[in-house]
Design a protein with these regions (language model features):
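N-terminal hydrophobic/helix-forming segments and targeting peptides
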Residues: 1-240
Length: 240
């Protein structure tokens, strides 16, 4: 599983002292408009701001509804009295600083966890919970198991390094896709047979299906058209 997440990086400071961003991972600007964010500087200072359209007032911008939300059209407005690039630089903000968006985490009375960026922290929690269960129940797996938590999955190379040499099989535990053309529901285990990089190992997928059936787990098998995993990154780095 992976514990890294999506965000932004300052790629420039414009003449108004506002921040232009470049995506970290697949952070879609459509999903972050008007979101509160934090800017982490190299000096350790943290500044708050809002990620919004450059011409953000619908009362002023006649093209507001028609403007594509892209990183070129959007900016971070700092919660500081800055009016120029020099003002912002004086705060210690510079190109390369990390920008984190508010996850807006909520746990409902009915037990639902709602938040941005649950991908893939929930899976990390599940694996740690499984390890705790094995220890407390004094159960020993029939095979040697590593829990490998990566921190570069969202940028594509998380599973390509630091995999122990004696590993014979890699199972990537990640979010499950739900959407048009897929059969999985939010309450099921999702088994990915193929993603944008091609099919996964036939025998491994078959074994996962059989394990789910044996355990009487509700599951679905799907193809993810726009996805890649740490297991795929491992394969691309000769972890066959």
């Amino acid at each position: 599983a992976h514990m890294d997440t999506l965000g932004g990086m300052v790629c420039s400071i414009n003449e108004k002292g506002r921040l232009m961003l470049s995506a970290l991972g697949g952070m879609n600007p459509n999903n972050a408009e008007a979101e509160n964010c934090r800017v982490y500087t190299r000096s350790g200072k943290v500044y708050s701001g809002t990620f919004q359209l450059k011409n953000a007032s619908i009362h002023v911008n006649g093209s507001y509804n028609d403007t594509a939300r892209s990183y070129d059209a959007m900016e971070v407005v700092l919660d500081e009295p800055v009016e120029s690039k020099a003002d912002t630089e004086a705060l210690g903000i510079m190109t390369g600083d990390i920008v984190c968006f508010d996850p807006r985490t909520t746990v409902t009375e009915s037990g639902y966890i709602k938040s941005r960026f649950l991908d893939d922290k929930l899976s990390v929690g599940i694996l740690l919970g499984f390890a705790k269960y094995l220890k407390e129940s004094d159960k020993k797996p029939a095979r040697k198991i590593y829990q490998h938590i990566t921190v570069f999955e969202e940028v594509g190379h998380g599973g390509s390094a630091s995999i122990p040499a004696d590993v014979a099989e890699i199972l990537a535990v990640d979010m499950g896709c739900v959407g048009d053309g897929l059969s999985c529901k939010e309450t099921q285990v999702s088994i990915c047979a193929k993603d944008s990089g091609g099919p996964y190992h036939y025998d491994v997928v078959s074994a996962l299906i059989e394990a789910a059936r044996t355990a009487k787990v509700d599951f679905a098998v799907d193809v993810y058209p726009h996805y890649g995993s740490d297991a795929e990154a491992g394969l691309r780095n000769d972890k066959d």
